[in-house]
Amino acid sequence: MSQAQYAGTGRRKNAVARVRLVPGTGKITVNKKDVEEYIPHADLRLVINQPFAVTSTVGSYDVFVNVVGGGYAGQSGAIRHGIARALLQVDPDFRDSLKRAGLLTRDSRKVERKKPGLKKARKASQFSKR
């Protein structure tokens, strides 16, 4: 007999995370590595656990994540978004608390492209009047 699995996809910046929740002990595995090994920053690991804290389900589910693209911050945000979406499948009553915490909203900010003639996206060389 197979256990119930809940899936969710999260995105942030250039990162895309495919998340599976399985009832368990709260172990988080990212790209077949433990989360402490994969994401070295403790504050980013707190970001990943936010959906569980908001819904009072800390330690209730094992999380299996496959994440590609972006850096540590983008991937952590994508994992958080995916976990929040997967928790909606667990219990639709979580929607109100997750929405209030802003965890279901896709953060649409992306890196602005560099423009020709400028040094960066908006930084120009110093203007000389004469």
Swiss-Prot record:
| GO molecular function, a single term | structural constituent of ribosome
Cysteine pairings via disulfide bonds: none
- Any one Pfam family here would be Ribosomal_S9
Which Gene3D superfamilies has this protein been placed in? 3.30.230.10
Q: Name one GO biological process term.
A: translation
Could you list this entry's UniProt keywords, alphabetically sorted. Answer: Ribonucleoprotein, Ribosomal protein
Composition bias, Basic residues: 111-130
Q: Which SUPFAM superfamilies match?
A: Ribosomal protein S5 domain 2-like
Q: Where is this region: Disordered?
A: 106-130
Any one cellular-component term (Gene Ontology): cytosolic small ribosomal subunit
Q: Which family does it belong to?
A: Belongs to the universal ribosomal protein uS9 family.
Q: NCBIfam families in the record, alphabetically? A: PRK00132.1
Task: Quote the protein name from its UniProt record.
Answer: Small ribosomal subunit protein uS9
User: Gene symbol?
Assistant: rpsI
